């Protein structure tokens, strides 16, 4: 069964005759197809009875919460056989990006390590005599802004989105 969600017309208000098709070459656990640089079909490689967790959670957030910090589910394909259902694919808007979260984290960690390596030992003196938890609580105001630079704002935004996600998931 192929179906559109209530979000379909909002997500794709115009012509949905997609003729340009390309496969994403990224290493991931699913196969993804991009349509006219507007839509993404995520094909689940592991097919099991019941909904795929990625599909089920994304669909719930799209249809039952106000959480907007993820690509909404516009449709899907389910296989129904012998009274059992399995999710095969999900349709979402295609959101181009300059990279992925894992690479961002690796780059940030490398930059942090390089900055720490270049700092003289005197930079650590404000933490002398502090227990680990007190130092961790004080670190953001003493050193984090200088060492993390713009990444600190990205980490704060990630934390805020994660908190919003958990609130949305708990809202049911």
Predicted features by range, described:
Residues 1-172:
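Conserved ATP-binding subdomain of kinase catalytic cores across diverse folds
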């Amino acid at each position: 069964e192929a179906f559109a969600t209530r979000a379909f017309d909002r997500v794709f208000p115009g012509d949905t005759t997609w003729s340009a098709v390309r496969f994403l070459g990224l290493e991931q656990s699913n196969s993804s197809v991009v349509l006219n640089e507007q839509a993404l079909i995520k094909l689940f490689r592991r097919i099991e009875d019941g909904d795929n967790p990625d599909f089920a959670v994304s669909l719930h957030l799209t249809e039952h919460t106000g959480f907007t910090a993820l690509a909404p589910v516009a449709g899907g394909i389910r296989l129904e056989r012998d009274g059992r259902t399995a999710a095969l694919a999900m349709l979402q808007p295609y959101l181009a990006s300059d990279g992925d979260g894992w690479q961002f984290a690796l780059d940030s960690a490398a930059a942090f390590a390089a900055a720490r390596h270049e700092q003289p030992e005197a930079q650590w003196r404000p933490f002398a005599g502090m227990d680990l938890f007190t130092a961790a609580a004080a670190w953001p105001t003493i050193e984090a802004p200088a060492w993390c630079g713009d990444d600190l704002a990205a980490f704060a935004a990630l934390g805020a989105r994660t908190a919003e996600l958990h609130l949305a998931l708990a809202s049911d």
